[in-house]
Amino acid sequence: MSSSQHGKSPDQTKYIFVSGGVLSGLGKGVTAASLGLLLKSRGYTVTNIKCENYLNLDSGNINPIEHGDVFLCEDGLEADLDLGTYERFLDVNVGQRNFTTMGQIYLKVIEDTKNLSFNGATVDAIPYVPEEVIRRIKSAAKGFQIILIELGGTAGEYQNAIYYEAYRVMKLRQPQDVIHVHVTYFPSPEHINELKSKPTQLSVKMLNSMGIQPDFIVGRAERIIDNKRKEKVAF
């Protein structure tokens, strides 16, 4: 994407999905915010959205011992701490448009069903729920050239399958506008004293089974990842 594209209209938004594999706590939020900062420094208008797996409507009523402290947004939303990371890195105020949960999504689909928004159709999880995810992402992206979508949880969990299906559909419809960044971990067991790429390979294989081929892999490790491991993962 060149700087000559800066004048494009909002319907030419680029979508960068950021997912995680192998284990939780790898820093998907920091990765997404860092990418956003780099793109913003190049002159693009950038925003973020966090997609949570849980059925709670926000983070305010979740035990902080279980989920961590909440981040209070300017509009009153009690959200995940990753929104605080977005706010600090991008130097913008975040709020409702930058945060969604599976509970919000299902509630909206059920309300639309009750209001006959689907004209009496039989409403199944697929395709109606992923379509609501896509609608929310596009709504959050309005007015921006690039949006980074952080998918909560770890690849392969049944709780977040809907989000990955939404990505697959968007990639199918807009292949030139959608990419996938997968954050993984390369362990280094003490008794072996070398990096192991197999967990990352299996995580990518999990994505492949859902019809997803990541465009970039961000590898976290306790030492420099050598070319041998990079080649294994790239293959």
Label every PLM stretch briefly.
Residues 1-235:
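Flexible phosphate-sensing "switch/lid" loops adjacent to ATP/NTP-binding sites
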